[in-house]
Amino acid sequence: CRIENCHSRRIRNIDIAEPRSHTPRGNAIPSRSAATCHVMSRTCYKVYDNAYPHFLTCIVVEWLPVFTRPDAVQIVLDSWTFLQRAGRLKLFAYVILENHLHFIASSDELSKEVGDFKSFTARKLIDLLQSAGAKTILDQLAFRKAKHKSDRDFQFWQEGSHPQQISSDEMMCQKIDYIHYNPVQRGFVDDPVHWRYSSARNYAGLPGLIEVATDWR
């Protein structure tokens, strides 16, 4: 990893930034095995084997900057926390940016749990936008609603979650670094732990906003 053991060093004098517009060895990644294919969405991306963690991406339609609102971010964090405490999802790393999020997770039914996560958060986030009177964003969410979605007035997330199977410890570390350095690469912060809405602080041994499974090696 770019930082020892995926951000294992301690960081001092931390300034926290927020989004703005513009298993021990037993938990290690299993050796590659025959894959069972499950369709994740209407895209060509699939969850190949639930024994492996997957790198996933969820994007707001039209890349709208919804997560500049702390209360919007909290809906996502609360949903992940609920799924973890219910034993339905294991979260290894995450980052939330102004219009999309990346995370690494595993589950016995990953396609289902990610689908439930997107459905629940979409409803809650639209409720939040309606209560806040965010008409401009809501109009765009309504305009971009997929034609086959006849059961709703808005579409919050783009179709699919682009799952990528993580089949080795090396790949896991690379994806964690990609997640944590995303705000740095975009020029929002100088250090991964300065970004409030990511698991970089968890991996640096500092208090994080939610729990993640850092003992995957």
Task: Locate the predicted segments by residue.
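Short catalytic/metal-binding and nucleic-acid-binding patches
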Residues: 4-217
